[in-house]
Amino acid sequence: MIHRKRVLFLVVLIGAIFFVNIYVVSFRETSKTAVYRYDPSESIPLLLLGGLRGIAVDFLWARAIARHEEKKYYELLTINNLIAKLQPDFPAVWIFQAWNMAYNIAHEWDAARNKWKWIHTGLNFAKKGTVKNPASGDLFFELGYMYLHLFDQRVFKYAAYYREQLKQEDGEDNYEASLYWLRRALLHDPKLHNVLAIERTICHALWHASLCAEREENIDKALQYAELALNEWKTYHTNHPDDTSTNVSEFMSAIEKKKEFLQRLPRRDVW
């Protein structure tokens, strides 16, 4: 009997919260303030939970940590999606979960195919987050950095495989994707990342793109990226002449030498 009363009380409570939130949403929609439009599959759970959303999120985070420690990664993915639905407008949620999948979980696998599956899942998760947070410079930067770092052959054994899979599955070049998101980050006032650091990362991305094109024997492309990298560093040095955190002259000298070397090689245009 007591159990039935508790269940009935919870049902009534949830119903009350639902209708109160309907009223609040209705009020917001009639005001002049712009309100982000969630799709129905996301807005209904948010309305139902109302003030209990914080408790639900805390519970899900605890579950996520437990599933990660238990190496139950597919259950973890489901929980990640639930957390993102409950906190869609918090960029940190998307950043943390994307990094966890693309780095930590991917590291747990041995086969390149399995690693790539989780890297790809993490990238797509972050990209979904950019749709929900279209003005988050920090999320844009993290995604741009992931497209640069995860495909670095000096760091990751299967980076060349990841690069090829990205081309086949998404039709994307990781360096172009990296540059796209890094440049978007500069346009949206990042809160957690220094603008100078983002500008330097763009310079490095262009340089790594040139080196990668050289390895792939696409000399024309390597030269074009080298020229872009050199111009980017020159612009950076002009805009920030007092910055001593990076030896810009050393980078520009290395690029100039690489350009001279590439110009002596036979061309093979495979754009």
Where are these regions (language model features)?
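Short, Lys/Arg-rich N-terminal segment immediately upstream of the first membrane anchor
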Residues: 1-5
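Hydrophobic membrane-insertion alpha-helices, especially the h-region
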Residues: 6-23
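Short coil/linker segments at helix-helix boundaries
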Residues: 27-83, 89-133, 141-228, 232, ...
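Long, charge-rich alpha-helical interaction segments
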Residues: 245, 249-266
